[in-house]
Every structure is written in C-alpha cells, then in structure tokens.
Amino acid sequence: MSIANGETAKDAQVVIVGGGPVGMGLAIELGQRNIRCIVVERRAHPQPIPKGQNLTQRTMEHFHFWGVEQAVRAARTIPREYGIGGLTAYGTLLGDYSYDWLQRELVRPFYFTDNERLPQYAMEAALRRRVAELASVQTLYGWSAEDVSQDDHGAQVAIRQLDGDERRTVRADYAVGCDGSRSTARERGGITQTLSDHDRSMVLLVFRSQDLHRLLERYPGKSYYNVLHPDLEGYWKFFGRVDLGSTWFFHAPVPPGTTKDN
C-alpha cells in the first residue's frame, strides 16, 4: 500500500462505535456494499432484558433487505397465531375502560412487510449472526471506545479491552457514533444535547406468573398493557408478555431513592 503525505495505514473504511441494533444495522448496510468496517461493541453478548420489543413495518422492511427478516421472525417468542398488539386501560388493568393501542395492522397496506414483536436480545442475536456472514465486517466484542478524534486523513478511535489490559487505536476514513445517549463519539464530536431533568425513576422487572396469563384472558390477542392513572402524573404502568403463558416484564415509576434492595 502506498501512503502519502504522512498518512497512517487505515484498519477499515468505517469504524462503528456501538454494536446495538443501530450499529449492527449500519454494519450490515455497509457490509452488503463491500465497504470495510469495524464494529466496536462493549458487550460480548446482548443484554438479556426484554426491552424494545415492538418492530414496526418499516423496521422489518430494513430487515428484509438486510437478509435477516426470516431469522428475526423465527426468533419470535409468542406463537404466530397469537396477537402482538396492545391496549391502554384507565385507572386499573381490570377496570371497565380500555382501548386498543398501536394497531399497526391498520397501516399494513402501506408497507411491504408485517410488523413483528420479540425481545430485543433475540433480535440483536439475529443481527449479529448476519454480520458474521459478511466478510467486509469485523466485530470487536468486549471492547470499549475511550476516545474519538480526527485529523486531515481520517478518524481514530482509541479502544480498550474490557476483560483485559489491551489497548489499541483503530483508524478509518470515518467514525460513526451508534453508542447511545451517553455517546463518546457524540461528545468528542462536539454535538450537544438539550436535556431536562426529572425526579422520577422507573423500574423494569421480569417475572413469571401463569395466574396473570389466566387473568388477562379477558383481553384476547394482546401482548402489552398500559395503565394510565392521574396519580402517575403522565407516567404509566406498563405490562408486557415475553412469551405466551408465563414470562412478563413490568415497567413502572418508583419513589425517589428506590434501590434494588428496597
């Protein structure tokens, strides 16, 4: 390789900081175009938390063209014949008033694919498998981006191995920040955020209950349930199915000072 004007050899054309759904989606998009890229992701495995479960038709269109749609649908944890829509109840989940919420099937004629629902960790696993099929994509799992900088020749990302002492610098034409709201790439790029503090904390619990499944048979074909109440001051209590019959998640506000021990 010929390097001119003091330019240092590059490891890839693009370094992607963050290997969640956004980072992996970008890696697939670039990899399918034979653009060499490196994904730096701090977690060796997806977090086993059933968040981000609703996938819109537009998201599934992307998955289709990335060659991962069928793998994502196969990872669904609720039977195909059971509904994946939701409802909102007022006051209490067992009250007299509720209405259907996010009826995505109503806009199905405007899209190429159906929507889907599954835990984010299952979806991320499918994306990781697809990335592994692309020769132009290198993944560095278990590595954290410590710094991002640039010069006249491109971008540099200083990374650190989380389960060891190794450090290195990855060089590319471009660095892309896909590392969430506390993005190192965003901060180093001087991109600011406008934030507003609030005094409410939320808890996300995962639990098992077959009794709750039987209790909610009054809402056939529903997979997630919101409860609105004046005392919550605009926040909500949010139940959802992880599978059909036993496993659930619960998202709700908790008093200030709440910890995992109390």
Regions found by a protein language model. Name each.
Residues R129, Y174, C178-N262:
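Conserved FAD-binding catalytic core of PHBH/FMO-like flavoproteins
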Residues K10-A12, G164-Y174:
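Core beta-strand elements of the Rossmann-like FAD/NAD(P) dinucleotide-binding domain
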Residues G6-T8, Q103-D114, W248-G257:
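Short glycine/proline-rich turn/loop motifs
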Residues A9-V39:
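N-terminal Rossmann-like FAD-binding beta1-loop-alpha1 element of flavoenzymes
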Residues M1-D11:
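A short, basic/flexible loop-to-alpha-helix module at the beginning of a structural domain
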Residues Y141-Q156:
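A conserved short coil-to-beta-strand element within the FAD-binding core of flavoproteins
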Residues P48-R130, H229-L232, G240-R241:
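Active-site-adjacent segment of FAD-dependent monooxygenases/related oxidoreductases
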